[in-house]
UniProtKB/Swiss-Prot annotation:
Gene that produces this protein: DREB2F
SMART domains: AP2
PROSITE patterns assigned to the protein according to its UniProt record, in alphabetical order: AP2_ERF (PS51032)
Low complexity: compositionally biased ranges: 144-160
Protein name per UniProt: Dehydration-responsive element-binding protein 2F
InterPro entries, per database record: AP2/ERF_dom, AP2/ERF_dom_sf, DNA-bd_dom_sf
Length: 277
């Protein structure tokens, strides 16, 4: 009795003891849980034993909705649905293949005027184009159009050539003007302007001043002192007359005799006061 009751409970559900932990509690048709927790959905084709794989999902509700969409496509509105209340509110969505298979018919194209529209069915052949060109040559329109186009192209090329010439001339003038404005400078002058080298004209007066400056006393003694032994002759001094020698001598009578042993004494301050009285 227990076996029969247990079988009735799992009549339409997934296989007992297989799949994930919540597989036994799932009541959705075509939905089961993997051992690692993912939910998968499958559906059986009508009048066939084969199953169609619908994919794996994070929740059981998503897998049930995928099963319902597949059932509506395969069995129509009479199909068994896991979530019928959701399918009634929403229309059956069209697949991507059905959305982009629409092609306009000839009747739809004929509704639009031909002027200003691209004729899809027009496929001109090379023979028709050659005939049209020959007709234009005979009438002379083609030669006129060719001459006008050639003249326009020549004028464009001439104007472009002149523009290039003028631009080149302007650039050359700019370079020439730049050369005239900036003359060449000697290297020595450039270094003198920077202050690295000194001017020769400035150096000459300093050299002249150095030449005219009196030499130091050591050089005077060595070169041209009046009492140098080489320039002074003792013979001329001996030959000089006595009168000249006496004039050269100092008059000792004018100076008082001074003895180093004498005591130098100054007048007292009382003598100064007595002279004032």
């Amino acid at each position: 009795m227990e076996k029969s009751s247990s079988m009735k409970q799992w009549k339409k559900g997934p296989a007992r003891g297989k799949g994930g932990p919540q597989n036994a509690l799932c009541q959705y048709r075509g939905v089961r849980q993997r051992t690692w927790g993912k939910w998968v959905a499958e559906i059986r084709e009508p009048k066939k034993r084969a199953r169609l794989w619908l994919g794996s999902f994070a929740t059981a509700e998503e897998a049930a909705m995928a099963y319902d969409e597949a059932a509506l496509k395969l069995y129509g509105h009479d199909a068994y649905l896991n979530l019928p209340h959701l399918q009634r509110n929403t229309r059956p969505s069209l697949s991507n293949s059905q959305r982009f298979k629409w092609v306009p018919s000839r009747k739809f194209i004929s509704m639009f005027p031909s002027c200003g529209m691209l004729n899809v069915n027009a496929q001109p052949s090379v023979h028709i184009i050659q005939q049209r060109l020959e007709e234009l040559k005979k009438t002379g329109l083609l030669s006129q159009s060719y001459s006008s186009s050639s003249s326009s192209t020549e004028s464009k090329t001439n104007t472009s050539f002149l523009d290039e010439k003028t631009s080149k001339g302007e650039t050359d003038n700019m370079f020439e003007g730049g050369d005239q404005k900036k003359p060449e400078i000697d290297l020595t002058e450039f270094l003198q302007q920077l202050g690295i080298l000194k001017d020769e004209n400035e150096a000459e007066p300093s050299e002249v001043a150095e030449c005219h400056s009196p030499p130091p006393w050591n050089e005077q003694e060595e070169t041209g002192s009046p009492f140098r032994t080489e320039n002074f002759s003792w013979d001329t001094l001996i030959e000089m007359p006595r009168s000249e020698t006496t004039t050269m001598q100092f008059d000792s009578s004018n100076f008082g005799s001074y003895d180093f042993e004498d005591d130098v004494s100054f007048p007292s301050i009382w003598d100064y006061y007595g002279s004032l009285d």
